[in-house]
């Protein structure tokens, strides 16, 4: 398939209850012609599918999923709302079924355990069992049948089979007790096992759904930032419309205290806006005509008119939500092993149950038929693919959600796994270690300098987008300088800029450009230049031909949090490397200020990638932290790429991890989050595997020959319910842990 024709979509799936369900949905979607890849996440109840829309449509995918008893929500505009409504409806049904199950299961259990010798008790138990089997347990049997028709199986298969065996065996013994009496045996009934199993499984599902709902609180908070309506200005009148109906170019009125509905630019008025939910910065930002504003942020005290530039799924907030959803729906590398286990889990359990039954019959004969049946039923009931299926995705969901709440955006599960292995962190200086707001702090003029040169320098730097160029432009603007007319402009990557005016060539840039033109620093300036470098200043050299005219000293303040962040990273065993295009003395000064282990100076953008390669060649696992703009090659080369953004400058598509604020203290938090989330995944998987490895043999009766202990199917169902709930609760515990 041509990947250019492919579309990647995320659709909510309803009706899934266990890992086998998720695996079956994944399998059926992958079988469809035109589907390149499909991945189902049980915890988020979502399908991520890559397909060719010319070959297969979302409706066809929906129909394929419905054939095996599930449903796909393909209405993208209302998918979130539909999913919430479906979840609420399912939870309500589950609650009703659970209440009905216990209302009838409890008297059945009492009759079965304490009043077995009362005449006609079997008939009373049968009547009381029917609402549990036919109403509360109906979905188990319906889903199991649909799975069977598709030659697949899941947890519903195990529950349906175990309760059917217990109920049908009891039904036979109620109607035909003579069959056993004629053979000298007692006709036992197990209505209480069938009903209580269903009741316990439903309780487990109810608790699981409640707990799973809490794992998605982060995404719900983000979605809560999206306003439902906007006030559009048309022909001088204001009209409230739904966000979905808002178009690019519409004029929108925003009043004090309101959430901004879409991304756009202010065309009238000024205000202060609280951007903390996006940028993490607590202080409101002043906005005036021409400034950009973001959807979901809150207007403080001024009214303004804005033009909508990005609406719907194209806003920064929508991108953040989509990124978090996709990350929560991604699979950790270890999940591939779990998927292979869960794919064969139910068939293996069925085989173990049959084997258990046969061993009991062979060992004990017909006298042990009841023991054989109870043990087989217990094996079917206690086996829990849910715990295995939920172990990884619930931990990821909580971890990635907690990251989003802390303004740490993690692209996928692989990024979390990789971050845990990082031992070396490379920090780009400008905008990462420093504030990224350089200001001119000094001018050194050489002998050839004339006042008219300022206009030429101004004109040259106006055409450059480099942060240092912007600082020079700002300084000259404050002096009231006017840009001169220049004839040509050339940008030299990692070096600077070259312009011509008449028959003269002027240049401005780093010491490399100084050398390229064969210019030298006079003895008069040399000492002062060294002093500037030693104090951590960045230097821009300006000259004509082979003559140096001026040296501009530019200061970019080190962030208050940089030293503390580096300290925390070093305490966790990380090796810190400072990377900069500045000269040796400047780099040495900044590295000393933050206490980096090592610094690399004079690095061109292309050199930065080689630095990462060299560190990796030393056997290091490297994380590169930059602004995601001028160090994209190095970010791509690193084992983990981390971009720092702020407000409208968030470069979410660039890196595996995006820190949404300029606070470098988020970096050690991100590493802690990775470590804790991956550790949680391993804990969940360990206990899920251990539960099944111990529970299934005990249910089969392995303890009976030694201690006379035989597990009751009712206890087995309670244990199964607790196992999946405990996995979800363990994942939720991450919410209460400090980063």
Label each region the model flagged.
Residues 1-120, 124, 146, 221, ...:
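Flexible metal-binding regulatory segments at protein termini and peripheral loops
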Residues 23, 501-503, 543-683:
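Conserved ATP-binding TGD loop and adjacent catalytic N/P-domain core of P-type ATPases
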Residues 33-55, 59, 191, 220-314, ...:
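Conserved cytosolic catalytic loops of P-type ATPases
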Residues 60-82, 122-125, 129-229, 233, ...:
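Actuator/coupling domain of P-type ATPases
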Residues 99-109, 336-364, 376-394, 682-711:
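Bilayer-spanning, highly hydrophobic alpha-helical transmembrane segments
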Residues 105, 468, 477-589, 604:
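Signature of the cytosolic headpiece of P-type E1-E2 ATPases
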Residues 114-117, 149, 168, 402, ...:
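Membrane-embedded alpha-helical bundles of multi-pass transporters
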Residues 278, 374, 384-460, 615, ...:
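Conserved catalytic phosphorylation-site environment of P-type ATPases
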């Amino acid at each position: 398939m041509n990947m250019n024709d492919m579309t990647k979509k995320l659709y909510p799936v309803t009706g899934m209850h266990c890992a086998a369900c998720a695996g079956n949905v994944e399998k059926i979607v992958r079988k469809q012609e035109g589907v390149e890849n499909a991945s189902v996440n049980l915890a988020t109840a979502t399908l991520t599918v890559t397909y060719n829309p010319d070959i297969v449509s979302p409706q066809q995918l929906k129909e394929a999923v419905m054939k095996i008893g599930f449903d796909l929500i393909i209405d993208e505009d209302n998918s979130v709302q539909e999913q919430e409504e479906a979840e609420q409806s399912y939870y309500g049904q589950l609650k009703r079924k659970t209440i009905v199950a216990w209302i009838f299961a409890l008297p059945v259990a009492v009759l079965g355990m304490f009043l077995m010798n009362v005449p006609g008790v079997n008939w009373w138990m049968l009547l009381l069992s029917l609402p549990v089997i036919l109403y509360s347990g109906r979905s188990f049997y319906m889903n199991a049948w649909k799975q069977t028709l598709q030659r697949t199986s899941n947890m519903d298969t195990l529950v349906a089979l175990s309760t059917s065996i217990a109920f049908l065996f009891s039904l036979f013994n109620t109607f035909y007790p003579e069959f056993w009496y004629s053979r000298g045996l007692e006709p036992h009934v197990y209505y209480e096992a069938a009903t209580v199993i269903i009741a316990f499984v439903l309780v487990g599902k109810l608790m699981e759904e409640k707990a799973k709902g809490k794992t998605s609180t982060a995404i719900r908070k983000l979605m809560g930032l999206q306003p439902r309506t906007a006030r559009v200005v048309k022909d001088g009148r204001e009209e409230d419309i739904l966000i979905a109906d808002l178009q690019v170019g519409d004029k929108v009125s925003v009043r004090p205290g309101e959430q901004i509905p879409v991304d756009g630019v202010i065309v009238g008025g000024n205000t202060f806006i609280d951007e903390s939910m996006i940028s993490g910065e607590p202080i409101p930002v002043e906005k005036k005509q021409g400034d950009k504003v973001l959807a979901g942020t809150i207007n403080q005290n001024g009214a303004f008119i804005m033009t909508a530039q990005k609406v719907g799924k194209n806003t920064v907030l929508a991108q953040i939500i989509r990124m978090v959803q996709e990350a929560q729906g991604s699979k950790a590398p270890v999940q591939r092993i779990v998927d292979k286990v869960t794919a064969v889990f139910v068939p293996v359990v069925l085989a173990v149950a049959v084997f258990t039954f046969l061993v009991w019959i062979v060992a004990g004969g017909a006298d042990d038929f009841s023991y054989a049946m109870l043990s087989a039923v217990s094996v079917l009931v206690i086996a829990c693919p849910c715990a295995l299926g939920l172990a990884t995705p619930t931990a990821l969901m909580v971890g990635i959600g907690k990251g989003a709440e802390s303004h740490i955006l993690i692209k996928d599960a692989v990024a979390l796994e990789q971050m845990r292995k990082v031992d070396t962190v490379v920090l780009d200086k400008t905008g990462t270690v420093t504030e990224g707001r350089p200001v001119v702090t000094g001018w050194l003029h050489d002998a050839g300098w004339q006042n008219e040169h300022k206009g030429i320098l101004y004109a040259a730097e106006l055409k450059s987008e480099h942060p240092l160029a912007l600082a020079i432009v700002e300084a000259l603007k404050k002096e009231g300088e006017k840009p001169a007319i220049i004839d040509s402009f050339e940008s030299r990557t990692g070096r600077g800029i070259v312009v011509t005016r008449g028959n003269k060539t002027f240049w401005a840039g780093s010491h490399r450009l100084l050398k390229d033109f064969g210019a030298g620093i006079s003895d008069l300036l040399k000492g002062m230049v060294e002093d500037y470098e030693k104090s951590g200043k960045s230097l821009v050299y300006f000259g004509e031909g082979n003559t140096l005219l001026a040296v501009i000293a530019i200061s970019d303040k080190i962030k208050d949090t940089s030293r503390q962040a580096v300290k925390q990273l070093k305490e966790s065993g990380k090796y810190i490397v400072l990377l900069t295009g500045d000269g040796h003395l400047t780099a040495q000064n900044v590295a000393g200020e933050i206490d980096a282990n090592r610094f690399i100076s004079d690095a061109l953008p292309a050199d930065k990638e080689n630095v990462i390669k060299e560190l990796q060649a030393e056997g290091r696992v490297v994380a590169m932290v930059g602004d995601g703009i001028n160090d994209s090659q190095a970010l791509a080369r690193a084992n983990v790429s981390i971009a720092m953004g702020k407000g409208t400058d968030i470069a979410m598509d660039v890196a595996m991890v995006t820190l949404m604020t300029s606070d470098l203290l988020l970096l050690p938090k991100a590493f802690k989050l990775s470590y804790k989330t991956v550790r949680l995944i391993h804990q969940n998987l360990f206990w899920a595997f251990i539960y099944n490895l111990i529970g299934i043999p005990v249910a089969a009766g392995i303890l009976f020959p030694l201690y006379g202990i035989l597990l009751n199917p009712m206890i087995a169902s309670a244990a199964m319910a607790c196992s999946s709930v405990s996995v979800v609760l363990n994942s939720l515990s991450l919410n209460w842990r400090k980063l």
